Amino acid sequence: MQVIETLAEGLKRELKVIIPAADMEAQMNERLADVKDKVRINGFRPGKVPAGHLKKMYGKSVMAELVNEIVRDRPSAILSERGEKSATQPEVAMTEDEAEADKILNAQADFEFTLAYEVIPAIELKPVDGIKIVREVVEVSEDEVNEQIMKIAESARTFATKDGVAADGDRVTMDYLGKVDGVPFDGGKDEDAELVIGSNRFIPGFEEQLVGLKAGDEKVINVTFPTEYPAANLAGKDATFDITVKEVAAPAETEINDELATKLGLESVDKLKEIVRGQIESQYGNVTRQKIKRQILDQLDEMYKFEAPSRLVDAEFDNIWRQINTDLQQSGKTFEDEETTEDAAREEYRALAERRVRLGLVLSEIGEKAAIDVTEEEMQRALYAQLQQFPGQEKQIIDFFRNTPGASASLRAPIFEEKVMDKLISEVNVTDKTVTKEELLAEDEDGDDTKPAKKSAKKKAAKAEDASAEGEEAAPKKKAAAKKKAADEGDAE
């Protein structure tokens, strides 16, 4: 086999591979000899079929198998011998001329094919002990713990029917019918809908108009849908809701005590506080870790400047751009609405894609040099987490990861990256800084790994790399009329 390099331009490589016809024929003859005693051909005893006859009958099919195997297996071996790693699967090209292909299958012509690929650049790792980061720490107060417990208690609060009129904090059970321009709209009708006044679960202006109503009252409520409402046919529109109040119920008093803890399935209020404190600390810890990662990635970005494989950059850009356009379509906005242009956005996100690819290669090299691996147990836990997100679709998800090439990499990559980050955090210079909750959760655009501008569409793209720690509370339950459908479609951070 002869390998000739025909292109070496930057990271791009092209190779011409030539396997002499004689070598191909020799391999074919070996295979035919292996099956000689197994084939059954009328007129010949087992094992007595002449080699020429066997070749005439099966030669081309065996040669076709050889060609497929060579194209499948040789590229990786060739790159390994050259000490190169391909950024993506090498592109293989063979002759498309039928006459020439027939000659190859008949061992009358050399088998030639070309490989086109981009190499992963060699990365010389640098010491990281010069990286300095600030770890923001929030001290969770007793008041914050109690405040969170009260929210939990309120979600489990009981209500008792009352005879008087509805007030703030009361639960109103009602039937309603929503209309725009006097015409009912889809999702605007419900019966026995429950709404706690002051919960802000329905669109602005709705709940306040329930105050003062009692069971049996009927009223027409006038509201205006927010301009950013997800349903484009309702956004910014004036609407009316025909309301029939069926019950008004007052909330029971809520106290933070052992009785509340028992109601929530715990043995004491101290245990309840311990659990809630741990949850809050975990939430803050996640935000802190994201900020630490951003600081490390920003400094690694300054340390490593090299050409990134264009095919990887193209693929990353396509993913980002697809998400950006999806976000714009869902919000009903344009690039102009976001105070930018499509060309400017493309340039910005192209730079972001290049940054991501470069940093991904650096992290991969760090992990490889440190012999960091992802265990089968870790992969199983990641798969289980995926299954929990899609109840009822477990078989389809398992089949997808089992049968889709590269799908398991989507499970492995985040685990690998977090383990590499653990290593880096243990080696860089870390200074702890006590901050307030507000300071920790304040949006830090300049430090965001995605470098988003102050545009909502761009902020959404940022979430692919840097999940926000403070999730937005979902809008109402199934009461579609006055809720924001964004709770179903929105961000899961």
UniProtKB/Swiss-Prot annotation:
Domain (PPIase FKBP-type): residue spans on this chain: 169-254
Instruction: Please name the Pfam families in this protein's record.
Output: FKBP_C (PF00254), Trigger_C (PF05698), Trigger_N (PF05697)
- What is stated as this protein's family in its record? Belongs to the FKBP-type PPIase family. Tig subfamily.
Q: Which GO terms describe its biological process?
A: 'de novo' cotranslational protein folding; cell division; chaperone-mediated protein folding; protein transport; protein unfolding
Task: Tell me the keywords, alphabetical order.
Answer: Cell cycle, Cell division, Chaperone, Cytoplasm, Isomerase, Rotamase
This entry's Enzyme Commission designation comes to 5.2.1.8
Task: Please give the residue ranges the record annotates as the region Disordered.
Answer: 439-493
Query: What's this protein's name?
Result: Trigger factor
Q: Which reaction does it catalyse?
A: [protein]-peptidylproline (omega=180) = [protein]-peptidylproline (omega=0)
Keyword tRNA processing appears in the UniProt entry: no
Q: Which comment does the entry carry about domains?
A: Consists of 3 domains; the N-terminus binds the ribosome, the middle domain has PPIase activity, while the C-terminus has intrinsic chaperone activity on its own.
* Enzyme superclass (EC): isomerase
What HAMAP family does the annotation carry?
Answer: Trigger_factor_Tig
Q: Which GO terms describe its cellular component?
A: cytoplasm
Q: Which organism is it from?
A: Allorhizobium ampelinum (strain ATCC BAA-846 / DSM 112012 / S4) (Agrobacterium vitis (strain S4))
Its annotated function is as follows:
Involved in protein export. Acts as a chaperone by maintaining the newly synthesized protein in an open conformation. Functions as a peptidyl-prolyl cis-trans isomerase.
Which InterPro entries has this protein been placed in?
Answer: PPIase_dom_sf (IPR046357), PPIase_FKBP_dom (IPR001179), Trig_fac (IPR005215), Trigger_fac_C (IPR008880), Trigger_fac_C_sf (IPR037041), Trigger_fac_ribosome-bd_bac (IPR008881), Trigger_fac_ribosome-bd_sf (IPR036611), Trigger_fact/SurA_dom_sf (IPR027304)
Name a GO molecular-function annotation.
Answer: protein folding chaperone
**Where found?**
Cytoplasm
Top-down, what is the taxonomic lineage of the species of origin?
A: Bacteria, Pseudomonadati, Pseudomonadota, Alphaproteobacteria, Hyphomicrobiales
Glycosyltransferase as a keyword?
no
